[in-house]
């Protein structure tokens, strides 16, 4: 049950954070969008860690590699995201940081889906 809830929350939070992030990138929403994006990102990281906990403590098919990978990715995502605020002085190189943050976010949904699929396969959830 923890994996089902975790993957649904992760999907929703990453999708909404991605939408807010793109709108922020093109300056289409006001400054409150930053806080909404950060809140959704935090919820996505918590969901990812919930999935990591689920696969690490699964009765069958434990996978420590996926769990550790999800935990590390969950740490990197806000570090790079919050780091953007202080790295704005990089000028044109700032776009590289934005792209890295975007790729980490997409990686979060990817590893979350991998965890959910592995858990379902190993534990025969419908």
Predicted regions and their residues:
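Polytopic transmembrane helical bundles with strong interfacial aromatic enrichment
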Residues: 1-126
């Amino acid at each position: 049950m923890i994996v089902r809830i975790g993957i649904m929350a992760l999907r929703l939070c990453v999708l909404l954070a991605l939408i807010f992030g793109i709108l922020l990138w093109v300056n289409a929403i006001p400054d409150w969008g930053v806080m909404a994006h950060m809140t959704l990102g935090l919820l996505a990281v918590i969901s990812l860690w919930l999935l990591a906990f689920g696969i690490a403590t699964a009765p069958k098919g434990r996978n420590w590699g996926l769990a550790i990978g999800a935990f590390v990715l969950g740490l990197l995502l806000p570090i790079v995201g919050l780091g953007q605020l202080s790295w704005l002085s990089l000028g044109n190189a700032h776009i590289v940081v934005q792209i890295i943050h975007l790729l980490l976010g997409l990686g979060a949904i990817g590893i979350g889906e991998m965890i959910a699929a592995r858990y379902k396969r190993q534990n025969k959830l419908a």
